[in-house]
Structures are given as C-alpha cells and as structure tokens.
Amino acid sequence: MLKNLQPETIKNCTGNELNVLCDELRRVIYETVMQCGGHLASNLGAVESTVALFSVFDFPKDKIVFDVGHQCYAYKLLSGRAERFSTLRLAGGISGFPKRNESVYDC
C-alpha cells in the first residue's frame, strides 16, 4: 500500500485501510532502523497520530513541527520519501530528522 500511496489519498482510506497502512509503516520503520540505526520507539509510537494528521490536514500547505524530530519517520514515509527511506541516516541518504532542503513537507 505504501509504495504507491500519495499523501492526499490518505483522506479517502477506510478504517481498515488505515490499519493496514499503520502496520506497514511500523514494519518499514522497524526494518530500516534495524539496518541503518535511528530512533525506534518514538517513531513506532507516532505512527497512528501521524496517519491521523494526514487524514485531516492538507500537507504540504499545512505545516507540522516535530518537537525534536525523533517521531518523523512515518511522516517522511507518507510525504513521498518511501522509495528512499532505506537510505535513512546514511551518507547521501535522507535525514533522520525533518530537513527543509529535503522536502517541501518539512519546515
């Protein structure tokens, strides 16, 4: 589901689809952190709230600020960076925190 997901389509997902999406986000975050390092618990704990934000707000027009960035992995996955997520925190890869020059979704 995550591979072809566009951020704006989350608003049209059913409850069951959102549950499947959350499961997939947790799996991808877990697998990536086990390989690349990073913050696991804080990101797993923020999956449902991040999906809820995408189902209500209009990103990237609306902005979200993470207090320390340790909960942004699901946000990165949902905002068009799923294809590059396996490069998390690697040289030349995506950042482990929100970074304005990485995406219009980050502020």
Regions from the PLM with identified roles:
Residues 26-29, 33, 38-45:
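Cofactor-pocket helix-loop regions in the catalytic cores of large enzyme subunits
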Residues 40-107:
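Cofactor-binding active-site loop characterized by glycine-rich and histidine/acidic residues
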